[in-house]
Amino acid sequence: MNKKPVMLMILDGFGITNHEDGNAVKMANKPNFDKLLREYPHTQLKASGLNVGLPEGQMGNSEVGHLNIGSGRVIYQELTRITKDINDGVFFENTEINYAIDEAIKNNSSLHLLGLLSDGGVHSHIDHLKAILKLAKDKGLNRVYVHAFLDGRDVPPSSAKEYIINIENYMKELSVGQIATLAGRYYAMDRDKRWERVELAYNALVYGTGELSNSAVEAIEKSYKDNTTDEFVLPTVILKDGKPTGTIKDEDSIIFFNFRPDRARQITRALNDKDFDGFERKRLKLNFITMTQYDKTIENVRIAYKPQSYKNTLGEYVSSLGLNQLRIAETEKYAHVTFFFNGGVETPNKGEDRALIPSPKVATYDLKPEMSAFEVKDEVINRIESNKYDMIILNFANPDMVGHTGVFDAAKTAIEVVDKCVGEISDKILEKEGTVFITADHGNSEQMIDYSTGKPMTAHTTNEVPFVYVSKDAKDKRLKSEGILADIAPTMLTEMGVKIPEEMTGRNLIEGK
């Protein structure tokens, strides 16, 4: 039986811009791609920032791109997910955050807010702390203590004073909250089982012992005088009327507002694990909330933002329908069309074949801009001829990997090589009465120079990417505008004539279908 395969061809790093300077995509001789654009419906997709779950204005990347494409929904990074909820007001209804505050009110106890005090956005964000403080204020809780871990890595090394002043001003405005302790992340956020460091942070939090200071600003100024930058500030207890401002006690509530797990695990274990043996410590009965899941094995904690489920990704769903699929790429992008495309799952789905074509062994890809594109093309044509596959996902690495070298002529050659492959593969799919959707995961080689300096640019871009619908039946159809990467999977399923699963929040882009 001759199958009518539906293929997605991802031209990695192939973005669109009208700028001609440094635009390898525009300057390349690509008769096949240009012909497909003339003859078939096409549109542009947003592939950066909030449209792919990244912070506003942040360029896309291959991991995030393939995650969004393969899952058929916008996958929000934890930072963006929480910030979006705060902006939408949803955060203030979070069950676990509210539980922590309500328990403190019920028990007439204190709420302690632990976390990295900066806007670095890698482990935490000061705006998330502010949102919790606001909710505590709105619910009428007064005993709220901030235990500020100081950054100096994801932000400048001596910037903690600004963040301390910022949060103290905010708390003054709210009339809720006081800084109870400070500790450099070197101590409070160790991840290498150097328990002697964590113990110093623990002692400040629970026993109120360590360095002593009458104010947070005074403590940080003293550290700067001693040439100690933020990361290495010794755990310091802030005194009020000569006593620790607020130590952690039985029945207290804690919200650890770091969203990245790796450096939050150890201090969380010290405060919660029943059989903790990193150092001697008294065990407390706490209502402990972690912003995200730090580790499945940590005991006695509740999680404000549980791991996102990627149920019914494109690959999983197609497999559940009993259909066969192929994933094919060269080494550089193989993980992207398999692991990331499947929502971070390593194991192939039932009926999912994988073809890995080795990438060439060269120092940099400008030395061989064709990479292994021709080998990928030959292999996929053989696989199409087998009539086995209902769906094929293919990635050409060249526009991205050669784009990263910053060598314009090499990037131009890379595009021209890929264009030859696009032509041959499209012809073969059309011969089988199938469909090819051509797209990219993010931009890169369409901007090879920094417009402000004129120097080579090697990074990804925030530009839109193409989406071309190639099929014998497509010529009289139209594609909707304003699409995003998450719309690709629903569009492919529509073309395959199957229902879109409810977990996919992307939309079908084919007008009238």
Curated annotation (Swiss-Prot):
Reported cofactor(s): Mn(2+)
Binding site for substrate: H123, R153, D154, R185, R191, R260, P261, D262, R263, K333
EC number(s) given by UniProt: 5.4.2.12
Active site: S62 (phosphoserine intermediate)
Binding site for Mn(2+) 2: D12, S62, D441, H442
Details of cofactor binding: Binds 2 manganese ions per subunit.
Complex formation: Monomer.
Protein name: 2,3-bisphosphoglycerate-independent phosphoglycerate mutase
Function: Catalyzes the interconversion of 2-phosphoglycerate and 3-phosphoglycerate.
Positions bound to Mn(2+) 1: D400, H404, H460
Gene Ontology MF, one: manganese ion binding
Organism per entry: Clostridium tetani (strain Massachusetts / E88)
One Pfam family here: Metalloenzyme
BP GO terms, sorted: glucose catabolic process; glycolytic process
GO cellular component, as recorded: cytosol
Family the entry assigns: Belongs to the BPG-independent phosphoglycerate mutase family.
The reaction(s) this protein catalyses: (2R)-2-phosphoglycerate = (2R)-3-phosphoglycerate
Pathway in which the depicted protein is active: Carbohydrate degradation; glycolysis; pyruvate from D-glyceraldehyde 3-phosphate: step 3/5
Keywords annotated in UniProt: Glycolysis, Isomerase, Manganese, Metal-binding
Coiled-coil ranges from the UniProt annotation: none
UniProt keyword Manganese, yes or no: yes
